[in-house]
């Protein structure tokens, strides 16, 4: 599913191509591009869920904390998000790319991927997609885009 999401993001969203394509035509295009039908459906559902996070009712249920609060992960989240990825999320909060609200959106979207092994690169793409979809996060999106395309980003302790 991650391949489909990255393809859609790079082809339509990131390249400023207008995405006024009917879902059926988009599905056909993705299938012709060689993606599996199940991955296509899951990716489109994932994008719909991401778009729903912009709704005020959905925002209300996302917990926000103060700048000194610490995120405690559930066991399911620990199982789905490895230590390196959790550390990267903390790093993004510390450098103000993510807020507690956008962090929660990222975690929710990562868990919706239903993947056994989330790579750091996949996490970076999810963060980028979330930030792209949240109004007022243009600066954070730009910073994340730089982090995504810079391979020598390291966490220093």
Curated annotation (Swiss-Prot):
<protein>
    <recommendedName>
        <fullName>Protein Smg homolog</fullName>
    </recommendedName>
</protein>
<dbReference type="InterPro" id="IPR007456">
    <property type="entry name" value="Smg"/>
</dbReference>
<dbReference type="Pfam" id="PF04361">
    <property type="entry name" value="DUF494"/>
</dbReference>
<comment type="similarity">
    <text>Belongs to the Smg family.</text>
</comment>
């Amino acid at each position: 599913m991650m391949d489909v999401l990255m393809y859609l993001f790079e082809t339509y969203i990131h390249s400023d191509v207008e995405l006024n394509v009917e879902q059926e035509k988009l599905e056909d295009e993705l299938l012709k591009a060689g993606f599996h039908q199940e991955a296509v459906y899951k990716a489109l559902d994932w994008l719909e869920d991401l778009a729903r996070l912009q709704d005020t009712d959905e925002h209300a249920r996302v917990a926000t904390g103060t700048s000194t609060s610490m995120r405690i992960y559930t066991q399911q989240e620990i199982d789905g998000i490895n230590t390196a990825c959790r550390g990267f999320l903390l790093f993004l909060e510390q450098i103000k790319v993510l807020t507690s609200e956008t962090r929660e959106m990222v975690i929710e979207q990562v868990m919706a991927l239903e993947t056994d092994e989330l790579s750091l690169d996949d996490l970076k793409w999810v963060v980028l997609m979330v930030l792209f979809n949240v109004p007022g996060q243009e600066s954070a999106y730009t910073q994340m885009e730089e982090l995504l395309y810079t391979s020598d980003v390291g966490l220093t302790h």
